[in-house]
Amino acid sequence: MHFKFFAVTAALSLAAAASAQTASQPPVFTPEAFRSHVAFLGDDLLEGRDAGSRGYELGALYVATQFEGLGLKPGGADGWYQQVPFLQHKLVDGAGSVTIGGKSFANRSAVLVAPSPIEGAQAVEAPVVFVGYGIDSTALGMDDYKGLDVKGKIVAMFGGTPKGLPSDVAAHTNSDKRRMAAAKGAVGIIMLRSAEESARRPWARMTQGGNDPALTWLGPDGQPFSAAPGIRARATLDTPAAEALFAGAPRSFAQIQAEAATKGPIKGFALKPKVRIDQTSSVTRTTSPNVLGIIPGSDPALANEYVLLMAHLDGLGVHEAEGDDKIHNGAMDNSTGVATLLEVARAMQESGNRPKRSILLAAVTAEEDGLQGAQYLARNPVLGDGKVVGVVNLDMPVLLYDFQDVIAFGAEHSTMGKFVESAAAKIGIKLSGDPLPQEGLFTRSDHYRFVQEGIPAVFLMTGFANGGEEKFTGFLGTDYHKPTDDLKLPFDWKAGAKFAQINYLIASEIANAPEAPRWYSDSFFGKTLAPKAAKATR
């Protein structure tokens, strides 16, 4: 196995060197080069590249040696690596329960209890306040906590947001609700399921994941990071437990569900039963690296401004509960993204024209565990006096067809959209709107961790034109996050080369532009996450 790894690495390094372009010639993107990266990273040898596993370490070594062979500079304090320390935590034997007014519900019956990064038995008992959707946002004019005292209490809320918000704003707001609850002084969160969510995702599917461990990265003080300090317990309730929680309330759970289906914000109120959430977690420490390489900028005035190109290297690993094929190879998700990253790096090095701004290339860990590696990189920068001014994220292009259009998530919020338009036009690619707004994709990949820090970002998805809808949705329904996401899929490797080319053009335009990317003055994300940053007008 080691022989196979080093033989492939050496062969690809020689191939990269042999294909060097004459200075100033436009770089060539080939299906063969793109496929070579996916073929290695998606091989059974890497066992699905789960963060912290040996397979992931092999993938990280592959990327690092590719960076070295291309002549990049190491970007981490540990050479090519930024080691990310993690706590891996899970419920002991799946143990956990929620007691509502004296009635106990075992974990996975009608409740799901979240593990804690604090080892040992934990219990949180407190009164409960229903807070509607649990949103407190001045920017949106919403305050579900108005008139409610939740300090020291558990808050119960519906997932999601009221209807009518733009999909990306809704997804961001939903992801920020833990922080909002903590800011109000709550000690626990109970998530309720709307009738729509229950129909879309039955409880049996909610409990399929078993007792998979969660990851939380550790800060410099050795403590687990939390965006919601003070929240000590979390649980999700199915309908029987939710009905018990609303016993004796001014409105029943069924009435509240009906309101959620038809109305905007829902007025909250205190609930009668006291609730106790019990769980016992085991904790182990592990590390997993982000792999970082740098192409220094050629303009001394701009070289401290970095364009970040990022792709997650991790996958889902090996799942013993699966059938004969237990390995989640992650060929599409996200060997293709890493292949794009490597091909863009090669093209930039071989073009003979260094970009004016510097380029930080990052293959990050633990995306599948909640965008953890990207968040660690965003909050633990490696650039000294330099700063990231824009992010181009590369995550799971579905390469089963000759795509003719792309969706550029985030493009409408900043001047990065102009670079995407220009790059796409150069190779005859059209831009399309989001065909899957219900998925909230803008907040579900690594670039979002930099958006949260106030940095503009774009993330390209292959579009639905030219038969793409059938191929894309078919992959999501049949192969996404399954062992069948492997090299047996009918990849269109020419599409992979084209995807690398468009991202190369986008990154190059950003890196060589007179001005760094700016949020638009009317962008929700610019106003709320980068209020002091200079803005652009449309």
Feature names for model-found ranges:
Residues 7-17:
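Bacterial N-terminal signal peptides
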Residues 47-155, 159-163, 271, 283, ...:
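Noncatalytic luminal/extracellular "stalk/propeptide" segments of secretory-pathway proteins
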Residues 103-108, 216-253, 364-471, 476:
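Metal-dependent peptidase/peptidase-like ectodomains
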Residues 22-28, 44-54, 69, 96, ...:
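Second-shell loop/turn segments in exported
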Residues 346, 350, 461, 467-529:
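His/Asp/Glu-rich mid-to-C-terminal helical/loop segments that flank catalytic regions of hydrolases
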Residues 104-147, 224-330, 346, 350:
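Soluble metallo-hydrolase cores and metallopeptidase-like ectodomains found primarily
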Residues 26-74, 147-149, 153-173, 178, ...:
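Catalytic-core environment of secreted peptidases
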Residues 1-7:
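Bacterial N-terminal signal peptides that target proteins for export
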